[in-house]
């Protein structure tokens, strides 16, 4: 516990809040060629690289990821959720925030079923998270 004298000299400092998805908090004015501080829930971007990486220590897999250049000029690494994807270089994708715990440096997810990204095939449960349309009912 600080003394009164220490508080008079220094005072309490507020905790500095830091965004977990900073690339979504920057906009870009293409007419003035200046970045702006307008945040967005999602951003559009173009894939510059699509590949797989291995997760951190206790886990083992080949996780799919894409390197994406956003409309604000920032390049980020985004995770491709679901089984199978149709992305390749120059695909236009929509990204949202949300990290992948066992992939270092991956702070964004690609939204399935938006722009060039197809939804997951033959998915029946949790379809909205993977951009899958409702299956047609079987005729009797």
Swiss-Prot record:
GO cellular component term of the entry, any: ribosome
Record bears the keyword tRNA-binding: yes
BP GO annotations: translation
UniProt-listed NCBIfam families: rpsL_bact (TIGR00981)
UniProt record similarity statement: Belongs to the universal ribosomal protein uS12 family.
Domain of life where this protein originates: Bacteria
Residues carrying 3-methylthioaspartic acid: 102
Protein name as it appears in the record: Small ribosomal subunit protein uS12
MF GO annotations: rRNA binding; structural constituent of ribosome; tRNA binding
Organism: Bacillus cereus (strain ATCC 14579 / DSM 31 / CCUG 7414 / JCM 2152 / NBRC 15305 / NCIMB 9373 / NCTC 2599 / NRRL B-3711)
